[in-house]
């Protein structure tokens, strides 16, 4: 049985992932164009114009929601790093988000002029509060890892060797500024709170990076390294377990929600009911989190100041300075490709749900089934692909690197918009049936899972040693903030053409253009650049101290 604090932390993953799993992005569109969940009849010319707007409206809402969540994530970063604010922010965002879902239950049975606007606002609030609450939740992770019995034992062994001074900044969970070996210049470049970084790194990322056949695994040589290794492994274990619990909760409840949605014929009310129940679930299972997670007492840093938010935004500029880009070209080339790919992958999920609803006229239960297939396929591929990679690497003269797996995954993902766009010129195929949608959902899931894992793995290989927190902060920021352009562009294309299928041409560009950019990344050279950058930074720090 996990310790009480860990159980409380797991409870939040169990609570929140249900809300994020339900494909609620089509609710605002349904309120624009339907009274009972059915699409507008295409025989009405005025209805066709309105139907085109229905298609694009949810994409605009999704774009605004992603932009808002990026702003919130950056702004609350400094506060989430303070124990006093961390739990308070988590509960505030959690119950604000759950309330945004529950309020869908209060909508009238027939749409009024204000219902689409209110649905869009609730959608934006739900997305933004969910993402920011996850930031606050992940900020607890390092402290929970340090409470582990094995980590405590490793700490005692390290201190017995007289290494406590060198480990003090690593082990102590305090909100005061460290005065140890971490440079203030390096700290100034963090985009997200330090306690969030291990959570970003831990979900199979470091394991994948170290499992690369071309990467060297360095075993701990003393008690200090043993402690740091044990802390990292414990963080990874807790994070992976939390992710698994969240996935189990999301898929299970999503499957259960098929019952009322199917029983009610996939009407707008059934979808509002599903979202409302997701909000109730989120609020209910946040109660153990509220009771069990530790809360900080008022003290140093507990006073809120607008300068804290300003400081968080100043950090962004320092991360993309020309000097940084020049010294680490391969890392920033990869980030450039990642921005396009992340936007393309996430927009594909939004566009596919809208396409299934508006073009294929798939009912709400069938759309939920599509979401379940994507998640199940993603988990299966995330487990199987690393095993296949290792087996191929051991049986082949040339190792299958993380970079090769990632590149293959991106090429495979481009098949989806290619196949959909084929429907513009071919009289058959091209995603014209529900069966094709199910097949593409499985295909996308098989590609999407490894894409996320191996993107982080390749990026981990390009990061300067000892500066993981700084550069994973940038990676996390681009992951959360890059996906607002795609939905807006697809929505605009749908408005201008009256056919959302043309939006997949844009998605094709978003997925194909980064391929040659990604092909320019030289991982081996990038590793050397990262080591040289770290050594140069260490030397500059030493000179400043002298």
UniProtKB/Swiss-Prot annotation:
Gene Ontology CC terms: vacuolar membrane
GO biological process, one term: amino acid transmembrane export from vacuole
Gene label: ATG22
Family: Belongs to the ATG22 family.
Compartmental location: Vacuole membrane
Protein name: Autophagy-related protein 22
Renumbered residue ranges of the record's region Disordered: 160-185
Free-text function comment from the UniProt entry: Vacuolar effluxer which mediate the efflux of amino acids resulting from autophagic degradation. The release of autophagic amino acids allows the maintenance of protein synthesis and viability during nitrogen starvation.
């Amino acid at each position: 049985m996990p310790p009480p604090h860990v159980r409380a932390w797991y409870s939040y993953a169990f609570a929140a992932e249900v809300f994020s799993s339900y494909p609620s992005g089509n609710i605002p569109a349904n309120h624009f164009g339907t009274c009972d969940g059915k699409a507008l009849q295409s025989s009405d010319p005025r209805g066709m114009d309105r139907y085109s707007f229905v298609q694009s409206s949810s994409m605009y809402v999704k774009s605004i929601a992603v932009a808002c969540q990026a702003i919130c994530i950056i702004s609350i970063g400094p506060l989430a790093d303070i124990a006093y604010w961390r739990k308070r922010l988590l509960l505030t965002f959690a119950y604000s988000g759950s309330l945004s879902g529950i309020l869908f239950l209060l909508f009238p049975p027939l749409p009024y002029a204000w219902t689409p606007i209110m649905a869009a606002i609730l959608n934006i609030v739900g997305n933004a509060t969910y993402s920011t609450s996850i930031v606050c939740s992940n900020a607890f992770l390092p402290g929970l890892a340090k409470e582990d019995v094995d980590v405590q034992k490793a700490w005692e062994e390290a201190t017995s060797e007289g290494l406590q001074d060198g480990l003090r900044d690593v082990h102590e969970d305090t909100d005061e500024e460290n005065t140890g070996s971490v440079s203030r210049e390096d700290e100034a470049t963090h985009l997200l709170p330090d306690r969030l970084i291990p959570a970003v790194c831990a979900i199979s990322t470091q394991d994948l990076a170290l499992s690369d056949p071309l990467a060297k695994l360095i075993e701990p040589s003393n008690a200090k390294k043993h402690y740091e290794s044990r802390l990292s492994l414990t963080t990874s274990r807790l994070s992976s377990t939390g992710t698994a619990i969240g996935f189990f909760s999301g898929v299970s409840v999503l499957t259960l929600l098929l019952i009322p949605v199917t029983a009610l014929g996939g009407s707008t009310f059934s979808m509002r009911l599903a979202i409302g129940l997701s909000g109730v679930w989120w609020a209910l299972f946040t109660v153990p989190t509220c009771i069990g997670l530790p809360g900080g007492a008022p003290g140093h840093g507990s006073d809120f100041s607008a300068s804290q938010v300003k400081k968080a935004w100043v950090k962004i500029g320092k991360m993309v300075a020309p000097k940084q880009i020049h010294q680490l070209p391969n890392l920033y080339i990869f980030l450039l490709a990642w921005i396009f790919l992340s936007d393309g992958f996430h927009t594909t999920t939004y566009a596919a749900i809208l396409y299934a609803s508006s073009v294929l006229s798939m009912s709400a239960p069938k759309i939920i089934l599509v979401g379940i297939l994507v998640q199940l396929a993603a988990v299966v591929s995330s487990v199987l692909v690393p095993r296949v990679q290792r087996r191929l690497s051991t049986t082949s003269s040339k190792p299958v690197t993380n970079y090769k797996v990632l590149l293959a995954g991106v090429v495979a993902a481009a098949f989806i918009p290619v196949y959909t766009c084929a429907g513009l010129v071919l009289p058959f195929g091209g995603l014209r049936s529900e069966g094709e949608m199910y097949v593409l959902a499985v295909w996308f899931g098989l590609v999407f899972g490894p894409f996320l894992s191996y993107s982080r793995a390749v990026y981990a290989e390009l990061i300067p040693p000892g500066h993981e927190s700084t550069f994973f902060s940038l990676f996390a920021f681009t992951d959360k903030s890059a996906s607002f352009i795609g939905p807006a562009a697809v929505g605009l294309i749908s408005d201008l053409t009256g056919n959302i299928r043309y939006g997949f041409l844009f998605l094709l560009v978003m997925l194909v253009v980064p391929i040659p950019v990604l092909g320019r990344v030289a991982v081996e050279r990038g590793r050397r650049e990262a080591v040289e950058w770290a050594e140069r930074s260490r030397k500059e720090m030493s000179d400043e101290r002298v």
